[in-house]
Amino acid sequence: MSTRSVSSSSYRRMFGGPGTSNRQSSNRSYVTTSTRTYSLGSLRPSTSRSLYSSSPGGAYVTRSSAVRLRSSMPGVRLLQDSVDFSLADAINTEFKNTRTNEKVELQELNDRFANYIDKVRFLEQQNKILLAELEQLKGQGKSRLGDLYEEEMRELRRQVDQLTNDKARVEVERDNLAEDIMRLREKLQEEMLQREEAESTLQSFRQDVDNASLARLDLERKVESLQEEIAFLKKLHDEEIQELQAQIQEQHVQIDVDVSKPDLTAALRDVRQQYESVAAKNLQEAEEWYKSKFADLSEAANRNNDALRQAKQESNEYRRQVQSLTCEVDALKGTNESLERQMREMEENFALEAANYQDTIGRLQDEIQNMKEEMARHLREYQDLLNVKMALDIEIATYRKLLEGEESRISLPLPNFSSLNLRETNLESLPLVDTHSKRTLLIKTVETRDGQVINETSQHHDDLE
């Protein structure tokens, strides 16, 4: 409901609309004066009555009525000095009743006014209490919630920064370990290639050793065959020598003196020497060749043995390095897995803490929103109380004007009913006056905003009945 409608409705409720009766209007009082004239020609009293009504705007409502009475006795005329005091008694009784009703209405108005004053005081006290609570809530909410929110935000930022630094440090360590692992893997690949090359070289050396062993065996067989051939030739030579010696002994007796015969012994000796020299030379050459071959093969075998021993040593060294690198790789894998597990746990903890912080932030924001809504509700209640207070102030001012008007009306002198102006009047000659009721309606509209009056208008309406 707007301020204008509240003010208008309260004003209409207090003063009544165009259709309200005189009994329901508690803010209207009447003073009735009556004048009656008589004529001696006929008994037709003419009554003129004026009613003055005080309204909130200071206007007066006037009612005039004329009553025409016709009698069945047209020839009777009253004297001027004969007075009927029953009319005065009726007027006094009506005035007393009016005054009694006015007193009752004034008492009711005073009671309502006292109730309104008590209500206004109570509402003002409630307004002060609500204002104090509002100020207290503003101060406490701003100080407590703001400080708590800022402190928690600083703590959250600090933890987020710490977790970010820890995460960056772990990522750097992980990158370093990954680089070390890559370097060790490259080194392992190189060592494995060198090992394969050494094994291939060793295999070739083994092939050479096998070939040398086969060549040595072949040479040994050749030496044995040559020795057997030399023994056979020597045996054959000895047999030939023995045969020749036997032939020489058999033909020794047949000597021709006349003919000079060659020296067979010298020839045989020469042949033997020649064969011996050839055999010795062949034997020497065979021994030299065998010795040279054996020396070459021995030297090659020694070289191959040295190379094999060196290859074995290198292979053992490579094997030890491979084992150590494998152990180191396994250790690094374990360390990497543990670091990755720790990193996952830290990420999960970080996500959980971030979710908790988000929940805390959301809860604090909800509390802040609830506090804002509560403050807005208190402000609306305060605005409603201000509107009610303004309406009550307007009603109090209206009652004050009514009371002042009533006091000013009561202070007027009362009419003297004993000195009535009676004169003789012919009622037949008087025109018939229609009964009319004139009423002035004052509509006062007050617009307020934030407890301040921004517009005030008044309208007067004159109605006739």
UniProtKB/Swiss-Prot annotation:
Similarity annotation: Belongs to the intermediate filament family.
Gene3D superfamilies: 1.20.5.170, Single helix bin, Vasodilator-stimulated phosphoprotein
Gene coding for it: VIM
Record region (Coil 1A): 95-130
Modification sites for Phosphotyrosine: Y52, Y60, Y116
Superkingdom of this protein's organism: Eukaryota
Subunit text: Homomer assembled from elementary dimers. Identified in complexes that contain VIM, EZR, AHNAK, BFSP1, BFSP2, ANK2, PLEC, PRX and spectrin. Interacts with BCAS3. Interacts with LGSN. Interacts with SYNM. Interacts (via rod region) with PLEC (via CH 1 domain). Interacts with STK33. Interacts with LARP6. Interacts with RAB8B. Interacts with TOR1A; the interaction associates TOR1A with the cytoskeleton. Interacts with TOR1AIP1. Interacts with TOR1AIP1. Interacts with DIAPH1. Interacts with EPPK1; interaction is dependent of higher-order structure of intermediate filament.
Protein name per its UniProtKB record: Vimentin
